[in-house]
Amino acid sequence: MNDYWDIVEAIVTERGRRLRRYRYFEDLWNAIEEEASLIFLQAPTGAGKTEAILALFLRDLVDGKRRWHSMLHVLPTRSLVFNMFNRICRSLRACRIKFGRPSRVVISYDHGGFIPAKTFLEGDVTTTTYDTLLYTFYGFRSYGHHLLLSIGKIAGSLIVLDEVHLLQDSSWYAPALLPYHISNLIKYGGTVVVMTATLPQIFLKEVLNAVRWIDANVRRDPIVMNSRIDKVERGKVKVEFFDKDLLDVAVDLVKENEKPALLIFNTVERAVKAYQLLRENRCGDVELLHSRIIAGVRRNREEIFEKSEKRKDLIIVATQVAEVGIDYDFRTLATELSPIDSLIQRLGRCGRRRDGVAFISMKKENAVKVYPEIVIEETVKSLDEERLGRSITDVEVSSELVNEIYTEEVIKNMRKAVKGIEDVLSDSCSFIKEFSSNLFIARSSFEDAAANLLRLGVELPCILLPDELYREVLDLCKENESNELPWPIDVEDVISLIEKNSLSLSLPAGRKINIQLPGIMHEIRGKKFYLQIHIAYRQRSEDSSGEILPTILKRERINLARISKGFGLADPFIINPEYYSFYDEGYHLGLVKPYGRSS
């Protein structure tokens, strides 16, 4: 085991930390040495799960051998994919400094959007999203159907399914399908490690049931960090409940308590209001973080957490994006009420190095607008300040809390809230279970069944154009009646814009098929249109050779049924700049109200 510990030491030393020899690391390594095909790994936030799994693959690279063709690290969101990509790059650099190897390694990321070179999960190490992994694996990508290439990538790879709890939705849809996806990944030769801080017993049971017929070495008992043996090196967190609206007390909370401070709200609109309140009251060094800020700006703000020099008076106002991927020692946390597993993750942001205090607003109305009412009601019944504080470091306590909430009865009630979900779930399950039998049948035969392979909602890619370019596009549309307009701009400039100025707009299940989104609508000659940027291979004329040309697409409506079959739709919708907000001196507040009302 010393060889693995050497890798871990190199990684943590590079990050300015000292080595902690957690027992559960060796439990994981032993399970891999025993050639387990499926492993569940449960440990608290900040307990080194990533280093434990990286040590396995990086040790092989340093030694110049391969047990797996590659490593796929799978995460729920694009921002986490970028963060993990950078983290793995740093870990690899640390190994090169200490061991002089490996010399040549390809590390890539693939989040399903428009990337100049389509990697299809290529690379020695690839970070990717769950959606991208699965739609690539099953042969449904918006730009191609390279089915055998993606299946070949899965065979013999180490597949890390990280932050699984974030896939949970209001109808328990993704957790119901994921067990069958895991079964297929194992069936095609993958070694799967499921990593999470909170593992509901009912999900574990469903995964084990889905893989019971596979001839594979499945480790049925999760590898769990034992708090009596392994002590997480972090401060204690004192939890306090209060009955007021967090917006009403935000200013007083940050002024009266130690910093750095983190405030988490359940919606973008409320987070933006809090940010403005704190700025207006001159509360100090305030930053805003949520999912509807363009990618380049958001990445710059997230770099705060990677810098060695910490901003002691920092106040972060955020949404659910702060539940994972933030390694910062916040002394004070204030959050709105949310489901128990979400609360445990939020509390894990506090007291990473020293003791901290966490305040939880118990106003249920700010939670039930976002989360299933039955889950919030059950969470409130189980909440206890002392037990919640212990859940951050004690997996047994966090498991007890989670399992008290997510019972079969609660999940049944969650599904009842979404009309027609059982039929959709049945169709998707049938496709996943019968995938092997239908491997060489055209993917177009399964578009309806595969439209919701992981989520019921829809992700709309959007882009904010600079003012001059936006006016240029509007003029182009006003001068031409066509719904497909060649855009005379260098394709590399468009690709750069997509990388820096994009964001994703989430439309949850239950939205009507034809919707209106003022935030991405534009008035052209008195009519409303949606505008998309499409990049495709075209010929300028019959006599000319082909080239890649950007095109503006005009649409009078958005049909969610059509988009849901786009399987990773890559053509971004242009944002109406009137709906993208800024604070003083051009500070990005983001696409706060895409629906033209409370969002």
Predicted regions, residues:
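Conserved pre-motif I regulatory segment
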Residues: N2-F40
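Walker A/P-loop
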Residues: A36-L56
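Conserved Walker A/P-loop ATP-binding site and its immediately adjacent core
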Residues: W68-S91, L199-F203, V268
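Inter-Walker segment of RecA-like/P-loop motor cores
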Residues: R96-G139
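Conserved helicase motor
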Residues: I107-A117, V268-E269, V286-N300, T319-E323
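SF2 helicase catalytic motif II
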Residues: L133, H145-K187
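Interdomain hinge/linker at the junction between the two RecA-like core domains of SF2 helicases
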Residues: Q201-V254
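C-terminal helicase lobe and adjacent C-terminal extensions/tails of nucleic-acid helicase motors
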Residues: K273, H290-G296, E302, S338-P339, ...
